[in-house]
């Protein structure tokens, strides 16, 4: 079973913020397929659905970002999901808006949600899709920036990015060939 995790902070005030882009991608996939996060357990909202005949576990942690691993690890353990079947979607300050990077494994890169997942799983050997949100300008702090909603102009770009990342997930579920998916979906979204 594949496991798709979108990272974000819970609560209405965090909807459509830069830090919640992982939630946005998972929500897009769920809505497109008429799925819903119908279970809550282990500090997470989740569902198990079939896509292309395969079971897929979708998770959104119901913790704050820096505690994401406290939801992801127990749910994966409960359903016997191996880290190599995990893909985490999250915001990345080091990528410009409109860029998407898929990686087979790697460090947290300073992202507290990823640090928590790596710590709780005991490995960084899992797939991830990093979604560029750019860096703050005009002296804005990083926390203020990532908790800021996208402007209307930015949302035009980010809607394309959300759809692009969702297609990458769908392609991986269909083919199980993440290396091919990386080749097709890495880069700037037009």
UniProtKB/Swiss-Prot annotation:
Coiled coil segments of this chain: none
Record protein name field: Peptidyl-tRNA hydrolase
PANTHER family in the cross-refs: PEPTIDYL-TRNA HYDROLASE (PTHR17224:SF1)
Residue numbers annotated as active site: 19 (proton acceptor)
Keywords, alphabetical: Cytoplasm, Hydrolase, RNA-binding, tRNA-binding
GO MF, any single term: tRNA binding
Regions that span the bilayer: none
Site features described as Stabilizes the basic form of H active site to accept a proton, chain residue numbers: 91
Principal subcellular localization: cytoplasm
EC number: 3.1.1.29
Alphabetized Pfam families for the sequence: Pept_tRNA_hydro
Lineage: Bacteria, Bacillati, Bacillota, Bacilli, Bacillales
GO biological process entries: protein quality control for misfolded or incompletely synthesized proteins; rescue of stalled ribosome
Species this protein is from: Staphylococcus aureus (strain NCTC 8325 / PS 47)
Site residues, Discriminates between blocked and unblocked aminoacyl-tRNA: 9
């Amino acid at each position: 079973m594949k496991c798709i995790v979108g990272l974000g902070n819970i609560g209405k005030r965090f909807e459509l913020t830069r830090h919640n882009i992982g939630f946005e991608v998972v929500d897009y996939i769920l809505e497109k397929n008429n799925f819903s996060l119908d279970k809550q357990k282990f500090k997470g909202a989740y569902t198990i659905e079939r896509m292309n005949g395969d079971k897929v576990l979708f998770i959104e942690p119901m913790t704050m970002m820096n505690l994401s691993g406290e939801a992801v690890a127990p749910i994966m353990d409960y359903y016997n999901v191996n880290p190599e079947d995990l893909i985490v979607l999250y915001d990345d300050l080091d990528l410009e808006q409109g860029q998407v990077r898929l990686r087979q494994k790697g460090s947290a890169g300073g992202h507290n949600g990823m640090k928590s997942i790596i710590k709780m799983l005991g490995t960084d050997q899992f797939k991830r899709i990093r979604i560029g949100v750019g860096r703050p300008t005009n002296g804005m702090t990083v926390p203020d920036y990532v908790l800021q909603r996208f402007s209307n102009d930015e949302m035009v770009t980010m809607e394309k990015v959300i759809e692009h990342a969702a297609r990458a997930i769908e392609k991986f579920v269909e083919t199980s060939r993440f290396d091919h998916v990386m080749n097709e979906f890495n880069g700037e979204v037009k």
